[in-house]
Amino acid sequence: MRYDVVIAGAGPTGLMLACELRLAGARTLVLERLAEPVDFSKALGVHARTVELLDMRGLGEGFQAEAPKLRGGNFASLGVPLDFSSFDTRHPYALFVPQVRTEELLTGRALELGAELRRGHAVTALEQDADGVTVSVTGPEGPYEVECAYLVGCDGGGSTVRKLLGIDFPGQDPHMFAVIADARFREELPHGEGMGPMRPYGVMRHDLRAWFAAFPLEPDVYRATVAFFDRPYADRRAPVTEEDVRAALTEVAGSDFGMHDVRWLSRLTDTSRQAERYRDGRVLLAGDACHIHLPAGGQGLNLGFQDAVNLGWKLGATIAGTAPPELLDTYEAERRPIAAGVLRNTRAQAVLIDPDPRYEGLRELMIELLHVPETNRYLAGLISALDVRYPMAGEHPLLGRRVPDLPLVTEDGTRQLSTYFHAARGVLLTLGCDQPLADEAAAWKDRVDLVAAEGVADPGSAVDGLTALLVRPDGYICWTAAPETGTDGLTDALRTWFGPPAM
């Protein structure tokens, strides 16, 4: 069987991409080198923009049902929470969702939609030509080949797909070296000088340029991190042992606090790298395969998730033959600058969490700035991805920005705009008047849904004064209309983002 898309990697990025591709009708195979799902969670939360995207695909309730809401974001553990409440969002918070649970929910959805998932199958080689990609795979029963139109590497920072393509992964080497343990502790952890509200337990050692910080994962289980700066690991390839963590705790905090029942051990650095390019012909990269960074502010999983939602509808339309020729190129053009921005802000945070006394003045100044509403909002927009704006033709300030989840007044009552995106199609939203827009957009009705609303239930929304919006499947506004503009530019926007009209 020839697949439309093969995805290497069944982490959150690969699984969400599989869901998006199946909604577009693409025959999708996910290959995961690990034989079983992992039982530990590197990432622990989803930010506001990711929650919005989950709502748009009908997945929001599953994530929110059991997840605590974190109302304040975190920047460099400086103790001043980021305020999400100033954004026009129904979700001014992050959700505390362990990555294990995120992957469970996304796996279930991908399989329900018809994606095929093979665990214990590793990509080992690839060859591509103008017609497709041949992927060499090693599975439990030996090597075999898979044919597909496109291959997407969602296989992490050490991406095999990226290496097979020979794509450079330039960036900055680490100066922070940490060990992590998810464990129980018999002794009370020190409250002292922690790392802000998200890490209420901790010890800062300016003399050692080191710190210990911990936060609860569940009752009596904590994630403990001990970080040293400019003190490289003796052997970075060696697995972390309990003794490594005990020794680090004792050196920095004076005790290992009776650490026991260890669930997970790992290393952490502030290495930051970005792939030189995200695409080579019919092979693309997404998620950690094209960017890695210090996991400060919980941005990594969310960055990859949003890569998947940006890429999925574009690749699906390309496979369906409805996409304009340049559409797939906009994936890298839009997402690469966003990832570069995340690398910049995490590099800045890496300096701010370094306890070197030389940086104390910088930390104090940054704390003052975080109390300035405009600065706080700017950083909250970065961390949550609520303030992303893609390059878009036109002058209206909403172009290229996410559409808020508006409560629409319809003939059937009030309904949230997000519910119209469950099928991952474009939406032409009219507010009070749908003619002649419906006629002009009729030739795209196989790709774009017309949603006619009488208006918005909440006064003072971001769309006040507009009569219509064209919104891409990923929730970003690509055309607006006001009474004075009429339908000017609608056909051009439809062609740009959804291809030529149906015959």
Swiss-Prot record:
It comes from the Bacteria. Belongs to the PheA/TfdB FAD monooxygenase family. Keywords: Antibiotic biosynthesis, FAD, Flavoprotein, Monooxygenase, NADP, Nucleotide-binding, Oxidoreductase. GO terms for molecular function: anhydrotetracycline monooxygenase activity; FAD binding. InterPro entries: FAD-bd, FAD/NAD-bd_sf, RIFMO-like. It catalyses: 5a,11a-dehydrotetracycline + NADPH + O2 + H(+) = 5a,11a-dehydrooxytetracycline + NADP(+) + H2O; anhydrotetracycline + NADPH + O2 + H(+) = 5a,11a-dehydrotetracycline + NADP(+) + H2O. Its EC number is 1.14.13.234, 1.14.13.38. GO terms for biological process: antibiotic biosynthetic process. Involved in the biosynthesis of the antibiotics oxytetracycline and tetracycline. OxyS starts by catalyzing the stereospecific hydroxylation of anhydrotetracycline at C(6) position to yield 5a,11a-dehydrotetracycline (12-dehydrotetracycline). If the released product is captured by OxyR, it is reduced to tetracycline. However, if the released product is recaptured by OxyS, it performs an additional hydroxylation at C(5), producing 5a,11a-dehydrooxytetracycline, which, following the action of OxyR becomes oxytetracycline. The keyword Chloroplast does not apply. Monomer. Pathway: Antibiotic biosynthesis; oxytetracycline biosynthesis. It comes from Streptomyces rimosus subsp. rimosus (strain ATCC 10970 / DSM 40260 / JCM 4667 / NRRL 2234). Gene3D superfamilies: 3.40.30.120, FAD/NAD(P)-binding domain. Its cofactor is FAD. Binds 1 FAD per subunit. FAD binds at T13, E32, R33, L44, Q99, V123, T160, D288, L301, N302. This is 12-dehydrotetracycline 5-monooxygenase/anhydrotetracycline 6-monooxygenase.
